[in-house]
UniProtKB/Swiss-Prot annotation:
It is an enzyme of class 1 (oxidoreductase). GO terms for biological process: steroid biosynthetic process. Belongs to the 3-beta-HSD family. NADP(+) binds at residue 144. The active site is at residue 140. Forms multimers. Forms a complex with OleB and OleC. This is 2-alkyl-3-oxoalkanoate reductase. GO terms for molecular function: oxidoreductase activity, acting on the CH-OH group of donors, NAD or NADP as acceptor. The keyword NADP applies. Its EC number is 1.1.1.412. Pfam families: 3Beta_HSD.
Amino acid sequence: MMKILVTGGGGFLGQALCRGLVARGHEVVSFQRGDYPVLHTLGVGQIRGDLADPQAVRHALAGIDAVFHNAAKAGAWGSYDSYHQANVVGTQNVLDACRANGVPRLIYTSTPSVTHRATNPVEGLGADEVPYGEDLRAPYAATKAIAERAVLAANDAQLATVALRPRLIWGPGDNHLLPRLAARARAGRLRMVGDGSNLVDSTYIDNAAQAHFDAFAHLAPGAACAGKAYFISNGEPLPMRELLNRLLAAVDAPAVTRSLSFKTAYRIGAVCETLWPLLRLPGEVPLTRFLVEQLCTPHWYSMEPARRDFGYVPQISIEEGLQRLRSSSSRDISITR
């Protein structure tokens, strides 16, 4: 049994990681800003703190055998400084705390967005075949790229590191993406960008967690996966329109039937990016140029590097995942209403 710390253990993927690690017999502690009753139920210890506070992070990592660094500030828009503090400074604090406490293993949750390059497609490639993106105007992607580089550069004989890039995680327990999509669909405010024919990968939640456990089991100084990044998905690319509408159907929401052209959506995104900060409008920016590019571009990846280096094979197909989502959402009023 090991003592393992999960940053952001109260989130969607974080809870799946905590649940799986506890089931594997480990002592698990979550470091996050809030308090989550579900983690108490799982028997997970909780430490409240901010990743941007180096002393709090160093204290949390005392006596820890491995870290799953999953916490991040996500979202399509916001001040660069807020993303930099959470994603870059926070990650550097985790790395420094690993050094200070002699923690030998760090599994970092990254994102495929670090390779974003406008509308350039990524089709069937591994992470070592796709360079980091240029001009990452979205602060989330830009700061995650900086953080991932730092994590991989830190890999050495004392601290083994690996970065996983799960693509579009979905499934039961999602209290962010699917509920918002379903609400917009029911209100008639959801549009397809482009014709929706672009192939995209996605990752069922249990598969995303399993990839982390597989990497953890193989990670050690000098291991094949040490110091490397990997795309993670179900390995079942679907047209964007089909994926979105199958997810909506699973939560009893209407299909998307109307669309915006790329050019129109891109112009709207540019206007939103200008008006929201200028007028200090409340709420999240509804559309950005980065998001439009992501929605219209093929993004699907090779799982062969992850299979070869740490044995990752998706266990839950999209079809089975949708069935599980359908069963779960029928009991979850936040998604079905």
